[in-house]
Amino acid sequence: MARMSFLSFLLFCLTSVAHGNKANKHKPWIETEYQGIVMENDNTVLLNPPLFALDKDAPLHYAGEICGFRVHNGPGGSGSAQFEAVVLDRSTGEGLVRSKEPLDCESQKEHSFTIQAYDCGEGPDGTNSKKSHKATVHVRVNDVNEFSPVFVERRYEASVPEGRLFDRIVRVEAVDADCSPQYSQICFYDIITPNVPFTIDNDGNIKNTEPLDSKRQRVHSFWVTAFDCGKNRAQADAQVIVTVKPSCKPGWIGWTKRIEYTPGSGSIPLFPNLHLETCEETVWNIQATVELQTSHIGKGCDRDSYSDRSVRRLCGAVRGEVDLLPPPSPATNWTAALPTLPSSDSSLVFSFNGSTHVAVVPDSVASAVSGDHFTLQLWMRRGGASTQPPANQARGTRKEEETIVCSTVKNDDSYSHYSLSVHGCRLSLFYWPDVSAARPVKFLWKLEQVCDSEWHHLSLSVQFPSVTLYVDGVTFDPALIHDNGAIPNPAPHQRLVIGACWEPEEKPKDIVNNTMPENKDTGKFVSGYKGLLSGVTVRPGNVEPHSVVECLYACREGLDFGDLETLGSGMKVHVNPSQSVLVLEGDDIESFNRAVQQVTYRNSLRFATPGVRPLKLTTSLRCFSEESCLSLRQLEGYLVVLQPDAPQISLSGVGPHLARPAAEFEGPQGVPLFPELRIVCSLSHAVNTAAQGMEGGALMSDAVAHTLDGCEVQPLGEELNTEREELLVDMESLRERGLDIINTTAYIAITGAESISVYEDVLRSIHYRLAKGSARFERRFRLSCSEMNGRYTSNELTLEVNFLHSLDSLYHPSHLLASQQQFLHPSHHTGELSGHTLPNPHRNSVVPGAATVIIMVCVGFLVVMVILGVFRIRSIHRRGEGARGGGKEGGNQWDDSALTIIVNPMETYENRMGITTDMEGECEDEEEVVDSPDDTSDDQRIIIKKEGRDSAPRRY
């Protein structure tokens, strides 16, 4: 019974499971929205996300499988007609959407419809099938570049006047039927006809690349094509016809872009053939601006290449200036910490950063420039070496006050204070005659030169209460301000600072003792200067006259006007102080054209700085009818200053040998080294000074052509030994001429701009002196000179000095034995004749007979003659010079060779014995024998000093 119950229960469970497999409990699930893309030439839609239907009844057969998708119409009502969805895998539910027919992007770019998934139900017949929710599908049809561009017109025509450049002559247009921006847009046009003076841009605008000439070609015909962004070319090209109409050519005629200037030419016209054509347009005002750019030449323009001190001498400036920023040295170490920059004119340029770069001048130097009458001069450039002028030339944007020089000096029993500062585009001098009593006075100038980031020279002449400012040699008047505000008194301590101002620390007063604390120099630097400074000098005493200041620092090149008397009525000419901008203004065309042809460029330097100076001409016209008034473009060119002819400085009239007895060199004045020196400059000095265009121009041009600025005398080989030799120079004569000298054992350098004749006199006065007893046999010197701050150098003149020693000077009687049995011992002179070979000291102690002595003397004389001849032949081959002089007995006189003969003291021995002979003629027939130096029978010894070949490096 129990067994039957168990079988019944098992049968019931199997029946229940069978009924459970056929149940379809869940409906499929898909995404709510799909984005699709389909190409025009394809029917498969790429969906994002991919089409997958999921069913929770999986993995049941039928109920967990996806049997299909249904497409329903969207808002447009065309979804089911154009698209279908198929199942790719029933178990995973993957599906695919595709179009039933080819799609056309140009007809419809986007399609929207809904899609629904359904499962397989409970059996193969799909009983009890369930459907998912409806998902929206958006399909975008991607374009294919199937269409080519088509021009709107097949032919385009335009007419333009000749002689002008146009921004647009005619515009061509092409369209593309593709639907997408990528293929429907025209990316570029192209002129396919070669060698036509036209160009076309991407928008189809055609313009000419050069002025058209109707006489050369009246009609221009060419073809253009178009390309879409898919690089499809137009189906048919378009023809463009441009007709050139004869017309007037308004503008400047005769413009030359390149102008050459030869140094030394004076003034040359820049536009000798230039004239303005207005084509009968009524013009009531014409203004032309000529700009010459020289800011890249030196410090703002072409100036003298000499040192500041030399230029001051040439211009006749008063001496006595004190250099506040000298080159760093052990004696002038207050500038050692300042960074320096290279300069084209070899001057020293110091950089200041507004904080740490400050120069404190020692009190010993500051006390030398005290007083209320002084001249302060300096080169200044705001902002540093890398700063460029602002493009918009905005002024006054910098509000920080920057102090250039700040000085408190003691005058007798009081202290005076002044400071030179820049504030934006303003330059101010703050002067306090007496810091303990008087109130300060402020002199103010508003200058564009202060804030244009260019090099400018400032010269401030103070004769309190009168102050005069020169900027690049041009005078500027100040605005006087009596400042009675609450300004603290400067500390009564002498201090001169460059690049900032010293602000002492305030100390509280001791109320109990009613005293001030102990005076300690504590404080800080304030109002630091940011920029470059060079040549900062102060000269106490009377100020320089205007002509000297202009000669010192005015530009030597610039624009000028030829003849103001020929200027027509109604014409105006204005030239800026630096002569880099010239403005012409008038109302008459003919007068204006004549005036333009009078604009000149001048450069008063004989050795002008070569290079390019950009040139611009800007024209502004005003007409009665502003709408039709002509507009002229800016003309640009350049002026080329050619390389000047290098002067050939020739030194002659010296040597190459100078032979004198050693006794003359040992005299108190020594011997002049260059008594017949001649200095010649081969360059022609004809300078056109008729139209220099400025005061002092002719003077400088003439002075430059005949001026040297340095010569150097250098001993070759070893340096001078001050204990045995020296070069003597007339220091008083140098001071009178204002020349400087550097006198060392390695060289003597004389510097300063002076005429050739002055340098000849100075060099001729140089003497060479030996100390008594100096056994020197030769010394070589080299002389060279330079011009234009070392820019041009002379030839190197080498002089060999030979010292002729007598027998007594070489062999003092004390060196000989009283006995006639021994000759000179060489050890007595080895110290003096270092480097020379002396004979073997061993001698025969037996006194020879008279005949033997005579024979030995004759033979020795012949040996001397033979050896001299051999060495003369070697000297001829070595130097390439012919020997001068004869060779007869004791009357022989040799040329200045580096050869010294020392005769054996046998001759002295004979004189002391009273022996004479007349047998010299017989000795001439004797055999000529040259024995070895070691032979004990030698009676004559020859000591030879060869010419030295070492030389020191050249400083010129």
UniProtKB/Swiss-Prot annotation:
One GO cellular component term: cell surface
Intracellular or extracellular location(s): Postsynaptic cell membrane; Endoplasmic reticulum membrane; Golgi apparatus membrane
Pfam families: Cadherin, CLSTN_C
Tissues with expression: By 48 hours post-fertilization (hpf), widely expressed in the brain, with strong expression in the telencephalon and the midbrain. Not expressed in the optic tectum.
Chain segments annotated as transmembrane: 851-871
Extracellular-side segments: 21-850
MF GO annotations: calcium ion binding; cell-cell adhesion mediator activity; neurexin family protein binding
Name of the protein: Calsyntenin-3
Organism of provenance: Danio rerio
